[in-house]
Structure formats: structure tokens, C-alpha cells
Amino acid sequence: MNITAVIPARFASVRFPGKALAIIDGKPMIQHVYERTARASLVDSVIIATDDERIQQAVSVFGGVCRMTRNDHETGTDRLAEVAGTLSADIIVNVQGDEPLIAPEMIDQAIRPLLDDPSLRMATLKSRIRCLHDFLSPNVVKVVTDRDGNALYFSRSPLPFFRDKWQDLKDESFASGKLLCYKHVGLYVYRRDFLVEFAAMAPTFLETSEKLEQLRALENGARIRVVETEFESIGVDTPDDLVKARERFRAIQSK
């Protein structure tokens, strides 16, 4: 069983161009992601997938493995699938290139369900929502699951809708666990053959409505196992997020 992690990385990010090469604690962000991914105990190899020579050059400098891809991909999944189609790996892990504090344990947590259940083709992560802002924010994707941990739905809207408590929602309700709900953590694990199949599927109604690719899998009847993680990461989507990531690195070093 070979497990390969692929980190899609673009230079031309809409909200933060060049963020993959933004320096955090003396290293480009993409290097932090690469090194943390390589420390996952279940991952055999790590590849960065990019269409930009500047990122390729940076990866070469720190000794990472990089694959150049086409520059017409609309999504990171499409870029991932192009690379996956050239690999002999059994399982492909999609690690976001803008999560410099991702814990290696998170990656192992997401992989394990596919090792335990041969019929499972896709898995991802969730973590507790602990404040009202995250519950209401369309930038925080919510997820609900069945009793076996399989995804029922992902949404940018509040999910579930607490009808009888809506007027009384406050931070304490979430922090205390009185209202238990979850946000999606965008790390995906696929069986390689399913990833190639998934990328070839036509976009679906719910996917295009919510702008969430994973809904394409649900609408086509795929089962997605969602594992709860206690680890927290920081996604760097804006320059403000970069400031927060740098502060977190400094805090870790000062301990």
C-alpha cells in the first residue's frame, strides 16, 4: 500500500498572490507545509504540484519534490488528479498548500479510515465550532454526518439550524459544547482511482451553488468519512492571515 501526499500550489492566488512563497520563520510557506506533511507516519512520499516556475525553483532550493502541471486547471482537485494519474500510489492525500501549521497527526487521522475500510473511497476531517462567528460565517464550511461519521452535507450556511435556540445563540453556547456542531477541515484522502473518476465528473448543482467541490462527490453517491480532529491549523488566505501565522510561529518558539 503506497500513500502519496500531493500539495497543490499556485502563485496566482486571487486574494493573496504569491502566498505560497511568503516567508514565515525564515522559510517559504510551502516548505513548512511540505516538511510537516513528510512527518506524517502513514505518508510514503510528498509531491508539490504547481504550474509556476517560481514555486518550482523554491522547492528545488529546499530539496523537495515538485511536479509541473498544466496552467489551465480551474481547481486544486484538477491539478491533483493530473499528478495522480501519473502515479502508482494506492491512496492520494490532498494537503492544502496554505496551511503552514498543519499537524502531521491530522494527516494520519484522515488516512486511517481508508486503511480500515477497503470499501471507503474518500475521507476528510472536521473540528468543533467554538464561537458564534464561525457558525454564522459563510467562509467557515459546516458539516453534518450520520451516526457512522459519513458526511450528510457540507454548507456555508449555519448547519444544523437550531430552530428553537436561534434567538439565544451566543459564544458560550458553542464554547461549552451545549451546541455541538462542526466545521470542515479541508484535507482530503482519496483512493487514486476514485480521485481520477471524481475529477472527471461534471460539476453539480449543489457544488456550484455552494462553491464546494466535495458536494460533487455526495451528489454522485460517494460516501465521505469525516473524522473529528482536535488539532487546529491556520489557513493563509490573506495578508492578515499571514500575520496571524507568523505570530503563532513566534508563540510556539517562545514556549
Curated annotation (Swiss-Prot):
Enzyme class label: transferase
Predominant location: cytoplasm
InterPro entries in the record: Cytidylyl_trans, KdsB, Nucleotide-diphossugar_trans
Compartments where found: Cytoplasm
Classification via CDD domains: CMP-KDO-Synthetase (cd02517)
Molecular function terms, GO-annotated: 3-deoxy-manno-octulosonate cytidylyltransferase activity
Keywords: Cytoplasm, Lipopolysaccharide biosynthesis, Nucleotidyltransferase, Transferase
GO cellular component: cytosol
Domain of life: Bacteria
The reaction(s) this protein catalyses: 3-deoxy-alpha-D-manno-oct-2-ulosonate + CTP = CMP-3-deoxy-beta-D-manno-octulosonate + diphosphate
EC number: 2.7.7.38
Transmembrane listed as a keyword: no
Ranges in coiled-coil conformation: none
Keyword RNA-binding part of the UniProt annotation: no
GO BP terms, alphabetized: CMP-keto-3-deoxy-D-manno-octulosonic acid biosynthetic process; lipopolysaccharide biosynthetic process
Recorded metabolic or biological pathway in which this protein acts: Nucleotide-sugar biosynthesis; CMP-3-deoxy-D-manno-octulosonate biosynthesis; CMP-3-deoxy-D-manno-octulosonate from 3-deoxy-D-manno-octulosonate and CTP: step 1/1; Bacterial outer membrane biogenesis; lipopolysaccharide biosynthesis
Role noted for this protein: Activates KDO (a required 8-carbon sugar) for incorporation into bacterial lipopolysaccharide in Gram-negative bacteria.
Family in the record: Belongs to the KdsB family.
HAMAP family: KdsB
The protein, known as: 3-deoxy-manno-octulosonate cytidylyltransferase
Origin species: Pelobacter propionicus (strain DSM 2379 / NBRC 103807 / OttBd1)
Gene, per the UniProt record: kdsB
